[in-house]
Amino acid sequence: IAKIETKKAIKNLPEIIVQAAGQQPFGVMIARGDMAVEVGYERMAEIQEEMLWLCEAAHIPVIWATQVLEQFVTEGIPSRAEMTDAAMSERAECVMLNKGPFVAEAVTLLDNVLTRMQGHQSKKTPQLRALHSW
């Protein structure tokens, strides 16, 4: 698993994918916590979207990580932003939750959200769109 969390790793993601092409299994973790600090919060959606496009075109599975349903896992009540973020995680092959007293409930909630989102997301399209983040 290539954990992508720095500007350098984002810029080098195409090369990382090419280098790992012969090594199976291989996947990419979008480590959004450190990445937000590196690229700035205002660019997070753009950067993670382009990383998803690139991995999708290369048929590389993605782990959507860092602070997914974090408030819900720890306090039992999700924020509106967390719910939208969880819904957008449907584009990834895997979603990573942190530990907490409500993690089982978070798994159930996430399953319900992702099941409903399947019909709304375009996933595994055959064409790589233009990348603009680097």
Predicted regions and their residues:
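Conserved alpha/beta-domain cores
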Residues: 1-66, 70-90, 97-134
